[in-house]
Regions:
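Conserved phosphate/anionic-ligand binding catalytic regions in large, soluble enzymes, centered on
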Residues: 11-30, 225-249, 328-344
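Mobile "lid/hinge" segments at catalytic clefts and subdomain interfaces of large enzymes
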Residues: 25, 29-148
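Flexible, glycine/charged-enriched surface loops at secondary-structure junctions
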Residues: 33-35, 102-120, 151-152, 174-188, ...
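Glycine-rich, flexible beta-strand/loop modules in the N-terminal catalytic cores of phosphate-handling
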Residues: 1-11, 70, 77, 228, ...
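Stable alpha-helical structural segments in soluble proteins, enriched in small hydrophobic residues
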Residues: 16-28, 91-94, 98, 102, ...
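Catalytic phosphate-handling regions of large nucleic-acid enzymes and associated NTPases
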Residues: 1-14, 28-51, 242, 249, ...
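Short, surface-exposed loop/turn segments at secondary-structure boundaries that line and modulate
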Residues: 6-11, 17, 112-135, 283-285, ...
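Extended amphipathic alpha-helical scaffolds
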Residues: 121-267
Length: 344
């Protein structure tokens, strides 16, 4: 648990919390593959800056957060004003070097006061059992994974897994106790998941075929429509494959901007993108409530993408709100939101 007690506007509480969480876990008995750390990277006057101040970020072409271990980067979040690939890669490497410095500092503390980690046993799967299940399932799993229709594919995989699990349960039910049968079921499912992963990865990496049978550079069927809603300022429908976003844009006076009063300096937004992901879009039922992490995260992603091409306040003195309603989803509804939002 991270509790913010005091905030220096030039030092991000999020990055401080990340550092503190890593250090607290690292010095404890809890097994942990850290330590980790994170930094922000800005780009002002073609020079990279670690943890830029709010004033520097205002003039920065790049707002990049990099987190990772001593050996690798494991999280990236960014918004930018059309930064090229070479610059982005350099920024990542620059940020990772700063991450390493923070981790070295943590290591000094860990070496001094860190506790010995708890030992634990993982579930061990006999080699003979893995080989036997692989022989039984590999060919059928390969066939199921090549089914192009998503629901049909999922049903075929589920039926195959259930068939093989039941085969082993029936085969061993007279010899094993209930607890042993449950453990065997877990082992069989783990083996089947490994087989599914390896076959699917092989299809993608070696054969360059995607989950629905498309080539790596092949795009799903696209369709668009605009001005579907007669009483709105702007509306657009974007469909790619089985993913569909209905985007509605509304204009308001500048005084209707959103006021942001959080831990940082009070700020305001004249452009907002809100993303809604109802349960029916993926064939499920569920209650409607406050936005979850998905809605907040996808909305922020789409907002960052469109914000860079929104006219300045001097050119277009209005508040702009875009709402993306996901009507169906089969991958990358955030991308659909950006396209529909741009058209609306």
């Amino acid at each position: 648990i991270n509790t913010v007690l005091s905030v220096d506007q030039d030092c991000s509480p999020e990055l401080t919390a990340m550092f503190g969480s890593s250090l607290a876990t690292s010095i404890s008995k809890i097994p942990f593959n850290g330590p980790i750390a994170g930094v922000k990277v800005g780009l002002v006057d073609d020079k990279f800056i670690i943890n830029p101040t709010p004033e520097q970020l205002e003039n920065s072409k790049l707002d990049l957060t990099v987190a990772g271990t001593m050996d690798a980067i494991n999280m990236v979040e960014s918004s930018a004003k059309e930064v090229d690939e070479k610059t982005m890669l350099e920024a990542l490497m620059f940020g990772h070097e700063a991450v390493k410095t923070l981790i070295k500092f943590q290591m000094e503390i860990i070496d001094e006061i860190g506790e010995e980690k708890m030992e634990y046993e993982t579930l061990k799967i006999p080699r003979d059992l893995r080989k036997e299940v692989s022989t039984l399932a590999t060919e059928k799993m390969d066939k199921a994974l090549r089914i192009k229709d998503k629901l049909e594919k999922y049903n075929a995989i589920d039926e195959l897994k259930e068939e093989i699990v039941n085969h082993y349960i029936v085969k061993n039910q007279d010899e094993l106790s209930d607890d042993e049968l449950k453990e065997l079921e877990v082992k069989i499912k783990m083996i089947l998941n490994d087989i599914e992963y390896k076959i699917f990865r092989g299809i993608v990496v070696k054969e360059h075929i995607r989950a629905d049978g498309r080539k790596m550079d092949e795009i799903r069927p696209l369709s668009t429509a605009i001005d579907l809603l007669p009483r709105t300022h702007g509306s657009a429908l974007f469909t790619r494959g089985e993913t569909q976003s209905l985007s509605v844009t509304t204009l308001g006076a500048l005084g209707e901007h959103q006021i942001l009063d959080g831990l940082g300096l009070e700020d305001q937004k004249r452009f907002m993108l809100h993303y809604n992901f109802p349960q029916f879009s993926v064939g499920e039922t569920g209650r409607y409530g406050a936005p979850g992490r998905r809605e907040i995260g996808h909305g922020a992603l789409g907002e960052k993408a469109l914000l860079q091409v929104i006219p300045s306040e001097d050119e277009f003195p209005y508040t702009i709100r875009v709402v993306s309603e996901i009507l169906e989803s089969n991958g990358s509804s955030s991308q659909a939101s950006i396209c529909a939002g741009c058209m609306s």
